[in-house]
């Protein structure tokens, strides 16, 4: 990968991990695999249904990869919620990743969005129809305030993906545009609100902490994602509308300056996240800390982000940042590097084929008359 600023990336990653005092102890290996398989199995059966297969029209390999990535994110990061909640969130966030990777123009299917919403009709856009059907399974885990955040943030995400269809990085001088788009498609409020299921938290009692967590998480989780994604997106044609690249266009600065801007904002947000909740409800702080550490582990271990390539490149270097990065990477791999073959089975395509064959058999069964049934 030509011209990638490896040394800068190492220094930034190390500072981030030091700021949050990274030490992922969320699970034993057995617990991690158990939760991964539970969430995956339920989600895989969901997406293997004929309706989902027909309406999503996603390449089976891409759907499989998306599901595995999202299950990893949810299980690693939402370490305090129930397995059932993990599974339902995995389905919801897989839908969002499928939309994020889509290139379909949403305009025609959105012409009657509000009229259909008001009348209680099924949405014309297939993604909305499926997401709305699943939403009750997600919202049952949360109180009304957190639920409203999940709904609103999901709508924002759809709009952000719509904007990204135009591959528009903003006009030069439009300084607000990069952060506007990143907040829109970052799902920060959805993530921030989904950490507080009602079986663990009374949202009225913890209202101030939850509200603050939603506010802080909006930037922290998307900025960390942007930093950890920077390597995989650096020369990928599909990922040229990123926050860093949009900083370059709108602020009319160099790539190095844009990366430094993101770095400083991410580090400041990390400091805030730790400092603000340090003296608050211990259960709240524990939930946030587990999320932060699990979220980092997921990025370091998931193949989507290709950070093992950085590790292999620098593991024999003698610089302080290289040694620290490798130590953090190995620490993450020790707890989070679990082969999909240990938990991501059966494949969605296999389940879908079994369902299709069963439906064919059912369709070819002889129909008995009422007389034959009596006889």
From Swiss-Prot:
GO-annotated molecular function: trichodiene synthase activity
The keyword Lyase is assigned to this record: yes
UniProt key word Lyase: yes
Entry-linked InterPro entries: Isoprenoid_synthase_dom_sf (IPR008949), TRI5_ascomyc (IPR010458), Trichodiene_synth (IPR024652)
Gene Ontology biological process: sesquiterpenoid biosynthetic process
EC number per UniProt: 4.2.3.6
Pathway entry: Sesquiterpene biosynthesis; trichothecene biosynthesis
Domain of life: Eukaryota
The entry's keywords: Lyase
Family: Belongs to the trichodiene synthase family.
Function as written in the Swiss-Prot or TrEMBL entry: TS is a member of the terpene cyclase group of enzymes. It catalyzes the isomerization and cyclization of farnesyl pyro-phosphate to form trichodiene, the first cyclic intermediate in the biosynthetic pathway for trichothecenes. It serves to branch trichothecene biosynthesis from the isoprenoid pathway.
Protein's UniProt name: Trichodiene synthase
The species this protein was found in: Fusarium austroamericanum
């Amino acid at each position: 990968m030509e011209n990638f600023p490896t040394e800068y990336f190492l220094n930034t990653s190390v500072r981030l991990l030091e700021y949050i005092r990274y030490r992922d102890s969320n699970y034993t290996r057995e617990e991690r695999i158990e939760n991964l398989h539970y969430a995956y199995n339920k989600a895989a059966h969901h997406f293997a249904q004929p309706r989902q297969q027909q309406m999503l029209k996603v390449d089976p390999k891409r759907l499989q990869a998306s599901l595995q990535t999202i299950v990893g994110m949810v299980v690693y990061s939402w370490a305090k919620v129930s397995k059932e909640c993990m599974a339902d969130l995995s389905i919801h966030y897989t839908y969002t990743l499928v939309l994020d990777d889509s290139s379909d123009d949403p305009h025609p299917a959105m012409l009657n969005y509000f009229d259909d919403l008001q009348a209680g009709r099924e949405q014309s856009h297939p993604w909305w129809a499926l997401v709305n059907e699943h939403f009750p399974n997600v919202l049952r885990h949360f109180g009304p305030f957190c639920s409203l955040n999940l709904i609103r943030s999901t709508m924002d995400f759809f709009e952000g993906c719509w904007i990204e269809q135009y591959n528009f990085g903003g006009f030069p001088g439009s300084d607000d545009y990069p952060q506007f788009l990143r907040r829109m498609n970052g799902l920060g409020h959805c993530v921030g609100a989904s950490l507080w299921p009602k079986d663990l938290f009374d949202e009225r009692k913890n209202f101030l902490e939850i509200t603050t967590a939603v506010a802080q998480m909006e930037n922290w989780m998307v900025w960390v994602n942007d930093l950890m994604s920077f390597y995989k997106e650096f020369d990928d044609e599909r990922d040229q509308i990123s926050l860093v690249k949009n900083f370059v266009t709108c602020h009319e600065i160099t790539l190095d300056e844009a990366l430094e801007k993101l770095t400083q904002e991410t580090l400041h947000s990390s400091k805030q996240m730790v400092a603000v909740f340090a003296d608050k409800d211990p259960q709240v702080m524990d939930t946030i800390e587990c999320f932060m550490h699990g979220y980092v582990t997921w990025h370091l271990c998931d193949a989507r982000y290709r950070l093992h390539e950085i590790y292999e490149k620098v593991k024999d270097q003698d610089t302080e940042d290289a040694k620290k990065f490798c130590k953090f990477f190995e620490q993450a791999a020790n707890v989070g590097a679990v082969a999909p073959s240990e938990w991501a089975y059966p494949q969605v395509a296999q389940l879908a084929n079994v369902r299709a064959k069963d439906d064919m058999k059912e369709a070819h069964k002889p129909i008995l008359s009422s007389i034959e049934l009596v006889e």
